[in-house]
Amino acid sequence: MSKIIGSDRVKRGMAEMQKGGVIMDVVNAEQARIAEEAGAVAVMALERVPSDIRAAGGVARMANPKIVEEVMNAVSIPVMAKARIGHITEARVLEAMGVDYIDESEVLTPADEEYHLRKDQFTVPFVCGCRNLGEAARRIGEGAAMLRTKGEPGTGNIVEAVRHMRQVNSEVSRLTVMNDDEIMTFAKDIGAPYEILKQIKDNGRLPVVNFAAGGVATPQDAALMMELGADGVFVGSGIFKSEDPEKFAKAIVQATTHYQDYELIGRLASELGTAMKGLDINQLSLEERMQERGW
């Protein structure tokens, strides 16, 4: 049974079902219900949204299981939860609880600075962040069923998510015109498994979905990421740190679905209050940048 449920094909198929949708961070049952009613395809249950994690400092860990369970009981859509990079036990606890996906997340303080989780050893599918094709291929090689840009979480600034999406897409384009010898050299240069790169070259795309995450704060941000080739959008602090979370949630879902309907997006934006306050990425030191976590 577990071999069937835990196969790459099934895990990736589950992630494909979220394609074109919005996944929202929530910290309680009420927020989860708002997200579901707004049209979210899944929710991410956590103790604090990324902007609060950033503001609080210290060590950020897996959410209290009570919070995750509360969210799971409140909605019918899939529920994700975050585990620290390399923290086998946090991931096993979440798997035992029955979450639908685990995010091995740089938003939390890494538990292991050398190794990511061997995601292929779990039954539950994983989502992981990436900034470039090397990171994407390494995570896929470890068993990730879904990818997302790292962006810079909790900033309300889309610039890093844009950079990461463009970087992955441009490297995939370069890869598709390489011969086998060039792929071998490229694999060495970017620290990626040759077999994964060969698979990407043969298919002309990543073998898993790649969502946008890290800095999405407005309907325009969500639509931009879809324009750039994202398979869907994660929204962390952007919704529940806005002036009107319910309206923002619905607007971001609609903008993601109709990302080339600019008149609609304009109308949606005009009816909203103030978005979350953003941070200038250049004012963050390397140590403050969550995207630098992992390898």
UniProtKB/Swiss-Prot annotation:
Record InterPro entries: Aldolase_TIM, PdxS/SNZ, PdxS/SNZ_N, RibuloseP-bd_barrel
EC identifiers of the protein: 4.3.3.6
Enzyme category, top tier: lyase
Disulfides per UniProt: none
SUPFAM superfamilies linked to this entry: Ribulose-phoshate binding barrel
Reactions that this protein is recorded to catalyse: aldehydo-D-ribose 5-phosphate + D-glyceraldehyde 3-phosphate + L-glutamine = pyridoxal 5'-phosphate + L-glutamate + phosphate + 3 H2O + H(+)
Positions annotated to bind D-ribose 5-phosphate: 25, 154, 215, 236-237
One of the protein's GO biological processes: pyridoxal phosphate biosynthetic process
Residue positions binding D-glyceraldehyde 3-phosphate: 166
Active site per the UniProt annotation: 82
PANTHER family: PYRIDOXAL 5'-PHOSPHATE SYNTHASE SUBUNIT SNZ1-RELATED (PTHR31829:SF0)
Family: Belongs to the PdxS/SNZ family.
Function of the molecule: Catalyzes the formation of pyridoxal 5'-phosphate from ribose 5-phosphate (RBP), glyceraldehyde 3-phosphate (G3P) and ammonia. The ammonia is provided by the PdxT subunit. Can also use ribulose 5-phosphate and dihydroxyacetone phosphate as substrates, resulting from enzyme-catalyzed isomerization of RBP and G3P, respectively.
UniProt-recorded name of the protein: Pyridoxal 5'-phosphate synthase subunit PdxS
Chain's gene name: pdxS
